Design a protein with these regions (language model features):
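Catalytic-core signal marking the mid-to-C-terminal active-site face
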Residues: 105-179
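Glycine-rich anion/phosphate-binding loop at the beta-strand->alpha-helix junction
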Residues: 1-113
């Protein structure tokens, strides 16, 4: 399709998407979440970008997991973190079983993961306000000083918060019911 697009109009912008897999020789089935497949995606993106001059992204949203949950999320995280170093992080679609199944539950988990990765990939601001060295020196070791400072009040919501996973510590059922 690259040759066709360029032959029809040399100014046509063309992009590539890397999504490689390998065959598990024990069962003869395709595997997307293997280190070798990730390495092939990275190699494909680098070849397209640096040898061909073609913009290339790698898709991290495929999983070999059949059910929604932690395995699927872990596989997507592993693919995305590795590929995110070389490519853009695309959105996820709730796909399971190598894209053959859609799961609304997995889509919610995927959106959580995407929010986390987008925040992780955000360029961190490093300036006098962010470092707050003068404030740290002026507060020193006073008890409770940082929690009551203006700087903390201005920046306390600058952190990513999950809409699905809680940040509270584990509480036993008895303690939870006792409240």
């Amino acid at each position: 399709s690259y040759v066709l697009a360029k032959s029809l109009n040399p100014e046509t912008q063309v992009r590539a998407l890397a999504l490689t897999s390998l065959m598990d020789m024990r069962g003869g089935h395709v595997v997307f979440c293997a280190p070798e497949a990730l390495a092939a995606d990275v190699a494909m993106c680098e070849t397209m970008q640096y040898r061909v001059g073609l913009s290339c992204a790698a898709y991290g949203g495929y999983t070999d997991a059949k059910l929604p949950g932690m395995r699927a999320t872990r596989e997507k995280l592993i693919r995305s973190l590795g590929l995110g170093l070389y490519s853009t992080i695309g959105s996820f679609s709730g796909a399971l079983d190598q894209g053959k199944v859609f799961s609304p539950t997995q889509m919610i988990l995927d959106q959580e993961l995407h929010g986390f990765l987008a925040r992780y990939a955000t360029k961190q601001v490093v300036n006098e306000d962010a470092l707050a060295i003068d404030e740290i020196v002026s507060i020193g070791w006073r008890p409770g000083g940082y929690l009551a400072s203006e700087h903390t009040l201005r920046h306390m919501r600058d952190v990513w918060r999950s809409n699905v996973y809680g940040r509270t510590p584990w509480v036993s059922l008895e303690d939870e019911q006792g409240k």
